[in-house]
């Protein structure tokens, strides 16, 4: 479970905290000018951290459950966290399975394209083009990073949660009652429905369009890859597929050559890992049984010998009462509070009107009378402060209008 937790921490940091920081230029669109800049930034940063921590726990629970169930249900699969390790990543089996995962991507794109052409023309399905990609990705600090980060979490988390957990659980439940195949078929249908419903928040008509769209790929693409190869290779297909879609704003835009290059490099990471281990060992290796799920050996817990606790009497002193860590945290807290007040715009100049509403309306009516202007019946006078209008280039009396 420790490797699952480490993987969850990496994805939570890479695809949540750093991704939100990457959109730093756009967070100012939600800036409330009634609060200080430091307060706004503090709220945003705390929100990013809180979201990352929450996502970490969700990812960790999903990864631990998926790894455990897969290990029990499919003993011939390569252990999830050994796929990209020495003497496994540089094997021809991993290379062939990875290439196969890449080759599925254009097939999946063709299936989705054909689905919408058929359903929109013959069955009235509708999906707005604006939901395909978000042009705001180009406003981020590193546009290439956005697609990679989103695809990493979507690819690996969704395959763990929507594929590995239900299918492996269905197999184990069916196996418990000597109905392994029946349990597998039921789990296949259930995971396809859940996967489609989980993506039904995109605007589309009818409301179940995404469920219908993803039902078949969930079974014949991702489901079969998981059964035959393992969850890692299904995640690779899912990851590369999402990278292609999320990077569309970059490829449709002129320039952005560095971002296009980084997007290609990011999409090739699974192959680059294999190339790295192949160059490191200078040969292709074979996957032995110890790297398969059936060869998994749990790490035995360390036995701790009971030791008599030593009673140490400490006398309070400045060295142990004023702990340096406590002092450091307190200083950071004080500096942060001071900065909040220091950067806050406490004094805001306000130019209040020098006359009241009734006086303003009286002046307006007098102006109409002096200029022999008669308004049709039904017009009512009202007054408002329009001193901030950009039409005024020099100080002038309050603008009083009537309508």
Regions found by a protein language model. Name each.
Residues 1, 59-68, 270-283, 336-340:
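Alpha-helical transmembrane segments
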Residues 2-11, 183-185, 231-234, 289, ...:
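Membrane-interfacial loop-to-transmembrane alpha-helix junctions, especially the N-terminal start
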Residues 25-52, 56, 60-155:
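Juxtamembrane helix-loop-helix connectors linking adjacent transmembrane helices
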Residues 73-96, 284-321:
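Membrane-interfacial, low-structure loops and terminal tails that flank and connect transmembrane helices
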Residues 127-285:
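Transmembrane helix-loop-helix hairpins at the membrane interface
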Residues 319-342:
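Internal/C-terminal transmembrane anchor helices
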Residues 352-394:
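Short, non-transmembrane alpha-helical segments in secretory-pathway proteins
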Residues 392-402:
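Single conserved hydrophobic/aromatic residue that forms the stacking wall/gate
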């Amino acid at each position: 479970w420790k490797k699952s937790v480490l993987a969850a921490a990496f994805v939570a940091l890479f695809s949540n905290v750093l991704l939100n920081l990457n959109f730093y230029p756009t967070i100012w669109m939600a800036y409330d000018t009634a609060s200080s800049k430091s307060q706004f930034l503090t709220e945003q940063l705390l929100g990013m951290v809180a979201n990352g921590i929450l996502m970490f726990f969700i990812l960790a629970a999903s990864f631990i459950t998926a790894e455990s169930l897969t290990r029990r249900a499919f003993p011939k699969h390569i252990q999830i966290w050994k796929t990209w390790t020495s003497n496994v990543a540089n094997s021809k089996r991993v290379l062939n399975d990875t290439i196969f995962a890449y080759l599925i991507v254009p097939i999946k794109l063709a299936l989705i394209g054909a689905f919408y052409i058929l359903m929109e023309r013959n069955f009235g399905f509708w999906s707005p083009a604006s939901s395909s990609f978000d042009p705001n990705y180009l406003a981020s600090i590193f546009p290439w990073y956005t697609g990679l980060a989103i695809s990493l979490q979507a690819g690996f988390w969704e395959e763990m949660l929507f594929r590995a957990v239900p299918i492996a659980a269905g197999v184990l439940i069916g196996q418990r009652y000597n109905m392994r195949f029946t349990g597998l078929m039921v789990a296949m249908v259930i995971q396809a429905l859940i996967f489609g419903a989980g993506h039904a928040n995109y605007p589309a008509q009818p409301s179940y369009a995404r469920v219908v769209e993803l039902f078949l790929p969930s079974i014949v693409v991702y489901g079969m890859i998981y059964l035959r190869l393992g969850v890692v290779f299904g995640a690779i297909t899912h990851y590369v597929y999402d990278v292609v879609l999320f990077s569309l704003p970059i490829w449709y835009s002129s320039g952005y050559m560095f971002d296009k290059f980084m997007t290609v490099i990011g999409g090739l990471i699974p192959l680059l890992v294999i190339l790295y281990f192949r160059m490191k060992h200078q040969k292709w290796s074979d996957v032995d049984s110890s790297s398969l799920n059936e060869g998994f050996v749990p790490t035995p817990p360390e036995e701790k010998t009971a030791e008599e606790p030593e009673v140490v009497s400490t006398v309070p002193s400045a060295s142990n009462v004023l702990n340096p860590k406590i002092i450091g945290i307190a200083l950071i807290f004080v500096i942060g509070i001071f900065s909040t007040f220091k950067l806050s715009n406490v004094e805001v100049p306000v130019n209040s009107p020098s006359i009241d509403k009734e006086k303003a309306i009286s002046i307006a009516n007098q102006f109409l009378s002096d200029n022999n202007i008669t308004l049709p019946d039904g017009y009512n006078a009202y007054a408002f402060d329009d001193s901030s209008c950009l039409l005024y280039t020099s100080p002038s009396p309050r603008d009083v209008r009537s309508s």
